[in-house]
Amino acid sequence: MNFLELAQQRYTTKKYNPTQKITNEEIETLKQILQLSPSSINSQPWHFTFVADQEQKSKLAAVSYFNEERINQASHLVVFSVIDDIALFEKQIEQNLPQGAINYYKQFMQPQAEENIKSWLQHQVYLSLGFFLSACAAMHIDSTPMEGIE
């Protein structure tokens, strides 16, 4: 199946079957895929948390925007979190990225206001979400993008 066909078949799941579970092998594959997600300058300013424990899912569902039923029914919840500590992020890129990427950040992003840098970091997380949703579609795993868990 080519990517266009995959995109045409992808859908947002409205209701999950609570008896269907994603396998550990599929979870490990998804984790590897997320590690390979694209981001500007390969910054990867994110954390991904896979939640299968029903009690934890219920706690997160209770503070989500209108998605409580979906979260509680789904096999797993994957929380995409942005690194919001700019100093930590800058230390991370200094240690892990090539000099060209570091120079780009220092020249174009670092001089920006803190709110602009945080917005840029958040946009990187959305790139990984799109990548993840495409991976789920390719693996025939139902998915629903959601916002609202702080």
Describe the predicted segments one by one:
Residues 1-150:
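Acidic, surface-exposed loops and disordered segments
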